[in-house]
Amino acid sequence: MVLDLNVESPGGSAATSSSSTPPPPPDGGGGGYFRFDLLGGSPDEDGCSSPVMTRQLFPSPSAVVALAGDGSSTPPLTMPMPAAAGEGPWPRRAADLGVAQSQRSPAGGKKSRRGPRSRSSQYRGVTFYRRTGRWESHIWDCGKQVYLGGFDTAHAAARAYDRAAIKFRGLDADINFNLNDYEDDLKQMRNWTKEEFVHILRRQSTGFARGSSKYRGVTLHKCGRWEARMGQLLGKKYIYLGLFDSEIEAARAYDRAAIRFNGREAVTNFDPSSYDGDVLPETDNEVVDGDIIDLNLRISQPNVHELKSDGTLTGFQLNCDSPEASSSVVTQPISPQWPVLPQGTSMSQHPHLYASPCPGFFVNLREVPMEKRPELGPQSFPTSWSWQMQGSPLPLLPTAASSGFSTGTVADAARSPSSRPHPFPGHHQFYFPPTA
């Protein structure tokens, strides 16, 4: 709907009237009227509309308007250039902003990919512990935090972190100082593994554990005593050295262990020369009766010179199948210790263990308590000589020490048909006292 506020005369309206224009009133009055274009007629038909005028609100791209007065120090103002056809102002502004950001980012330095620095230190990988009063260095490797040691200054801890970072992550690692400061270290760390390099860094620090002691390898135990322990490479966390009443005693115990394991180049709390002759490993001066260890597979003989303190005896049981055997049984507990025979020693050195007129002795070595030995009935035994143990049978002695018969006589008596076995209770224990 268009509201036409133009006032027209009656004479002019008759000449220019159209079908859409209402006729003048019948009384012929010359007053004006309001025309409402309700039927969508064009105002150009009446000639009352003004021509369309286009005004440029922004100057052309090449036009620059300088607003400066005479004698004024105000710099000329440059109007912004309009956007090109078909392109709005926001993409141009976003592009300009991106260019500005890209120009400022190199000036700010390389962005770190290892997260923020430690809050308690200006160096990366360094943390200050108020309990110990030391600067401790750590590095993350394969999802685990590796302890590099405690240091007296933050600068020393930062250098330890830098060397570990170069070893673990290469030359592109984020470090605290310049890479040129570690040229000598780069030549040395090539021949070391990660574990060995970490161990070297810890040895150069002022202590392994986070204890409340100023000495290396010493910490205050929760029981109130001082604990000494030493770190170990490739495996266990530390080696426990013991608890001590004083802090100095624990520090000296650590020094002795460090010198024993790492030599004279070990890092100690006190002067290593004060431990001369004090850290040598103790030798075992115990000698077992002057006997030589025999590595040959043979049956060792019991030592009958010592008695066993408890009621259990080691039964050196001699079973006999000869009718000449005595019916008397002498039972006495003997020691379970077995002396070791020298290599090449003849078995004739112990004749009292085999001296008997019975040709059918065989040895059965086992521990049988006296009160629990079962009662066995009569049984027969074979006439052959046998050792009821694993191994080859020992050779017979050339002579019977107690009988005086030769070997041939005893062998003939064993093969004679008249010597048939007689039943008698088995598993008798015969004790032969040593000869003077």
UniProtKB/Swiss-Prot annotation:
Gene Ontology MF, one: DNA binding
Induction cue: Target of miR172 microRNA mediated cleavage, particularly during floral organ development.
Motif EAR in this chain: 295-299
GO CC list: nucleus
Alphabetical keyword list: DNA-binding, Nucleus, Repeat, Transcription, Transcription regulation
Disordered: annotated span: 1-123, 407-428
GO BP of this protein: regulation of DNA-templated transcription; regulation of flower development; vegetative to reproductive phase transition of meristem
InterPro entries hit by this protein: AP2/ERF_dom, AP2/ERF_dom_sf, DNA-bd_dom_sf
Tissue distribution: Highly expressed in seedlings and developing panicles. Mostly expressed in newly emerging spikelet meristems and, at low levels, in shoots, roots, panicles, mature spikelets and sheaths.
Feature: DNA-binding region: 122-178, 214-271
CDD domains reported in the protein's UniProt record: AP2
Low complexity composition bias: residue spans: 9-20, 74-85
Disruption phenotype: Delayed transition from spikelet meristems to floral meristems, resulting in the production of multiple rudimentary glumes in an alternative phyllotaxy. Abnormal development of additional bracts leading to altered floral architecture, inculding lemma/palea-like organs in place of empty glumes and lodicules, altered number of stamens and carpels, and ectopic florets occurring in the axil of the rachilla.
PROSITE patterns per UniProt: AP2_ERF
Motif (Nuclear localization signal): 110-119
Pfam families from the UniProt entry: AP2 (PF00847)
Subcellular location per the Swiss-Prot or TrEMBL entry: Nucleus
Alphabetical list of PANTHER family matching this protein: AP2-LIKE ETHYLENE-RESPONSIVE TRANSCRIPTION FACTOR, APETALA2-LIKE PROTEIN 3
Functional note: Probable transcription factor. Involved in spikelet transition. Together with IDS1, controls synergistically inflorescence architecture and floral meristem establishment via the regulation of spatio-temporal expression of B- and E-function floral organ identity genes in the lodicules and of spikelet meristem genes. Prevents lemma and palea elongation as well as grain growth. Regulates the transition from spikelet meristem to floral meristem, spikelet meristem determinancy and the floral organ development.
Subunit structure of this chain's protein: May form homodimer. Interacts with TPR2/ASP1.
Family membership: Belongs to the AP2/ERF transcription factor family. AP2 subfamily.
Protein name: APETALA2-like protein 3
Species in which this protein is naturally found: Oryza sativa subsp. japonica (Rice)
